[in-house]
Regions:
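Conserved catalytic core of nucleotide polymerization and phosphodiester-bond processing enzymes
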Residues: 1-199
Length: 199
C-alpha cells in the first residue's frame, strides 16, 4: 500500500519492510520497480496534485480523472464522483523540503492538536481512494438495508442473518455499483461464522 500512495523507503520501513532484512537500496529498488510497473497510478498522483495546486493558487475550479477541485471561501474542496466533497481548511501553496510546491492546510496533527499540515500527491490520492471506497460501502449499506446490519469495519459489513439467507446473494448485492461509478468492476467476497472474526 505504501507504494500505491507515493510512499518510498521510509513508508515501507514504517510498515515493517526493514524487518524482512532488506537494505535501503533493495527497498528503493522495490519502489522503483513498482512505479515502473504502475505508470497510470504514478500519473494519477501528479495529475491530482497539479489540479489541486492550480485550484488553490488560482482560487478556481479544476478537474482531472472525474475528480473536481475547487477553492471556495478559504477551503480546498475535492468533489468525489459520488458528489460528496472532501474539505481542506485554509489551504496555501508553500515550498516543501524538496524545494517544490506543496499544499498546506489547517488540521489535526499526530499530537491531536490543530496545526499546519502538508499534503502531497500520493496523500491526496489516498484521501480520494478511501473516500470513494467509503461511498461504495455506504451504497452497499443502503442496498442491504433490509438486512440486520450490526456493524461495518473499513470495507467489511457484518450482517446477522437467518441461516437460509444466501451469502452469494449478499455478495452479489454488495458488488452492485451506483450510477456514479458506471464501468467500475466491483466484486465482493464473504464468509459465514457464528461470531465476528477477521477473514
Amino acid at each position: 500500500m505504501a507504494c500505491g500512495y507515493g510512499g518510498s523507503v521510509g513508508a515501507m520501513k514504517a510498515m515493517g519492510a526493514d524487518a524482512m532484512g532488506l537494505s535501503d537500496n533493495e527497498l528503493k529498488q522495490i519502489v522503483t520497480d513498482w512505479r515502473k510497473a504502475s505508470p497510470n497510478i504514478v500519473q494519477l498522483w501528479w495529475d491530482v496534485e497539479r489540479m489541486a495546486i492550480k485550484a488553490v493558487g488560482g482560487k478556481t475550479q479544476t478537474e482531472t480523472h472525474g475528480i473536481k477541485f475547487s477553492y471556495e471561501s478559504g477551503f480546498l474542496f475535492i468533489e468525489l464522483p459520488s458528489g460528496r466533497r472532501l474539505a481542506y481548511v485554509k489551504p496555501r501553496i508553500e515550498e516543501n523540503r524538496f524545494g517544490g510546491e506543496s499544499i498546506t492546510y489547517d488540521g489535526v496533527g499526530t499530537s491531536k492538536k490543530w496545526q499546519r499540515l502538508e499534503t502531497y500527491s500520493g496523500k491526496l490520492v489516498e484521501n480520494i481512494v478511501q473516500g470513494i471506497a467509503r461511498d461504495l460501502l455506504f451504497y452497499s449499506l443502503q442496498t442491504l438495508s433490509h438486512c440486520f446490519i450490526v456493524g461495518h469495519i473499513h470495507d467489511e459489513m457484518i450482517i446477522e442473518a437467518d441461516r437460509r439467507m444466501s451469502l452469494q446473494a449478499v455478495c452479489e448485492q454488495m458488488a452492485r455499483t451506483p450510477t456514479w461509478a458506471k464501468g467500475l468492476l466491483l466484486r465482493a467476497d464473504g464468509y459465514e461464522c457464528e461470531f465476528y472474526k477477521k477473514d
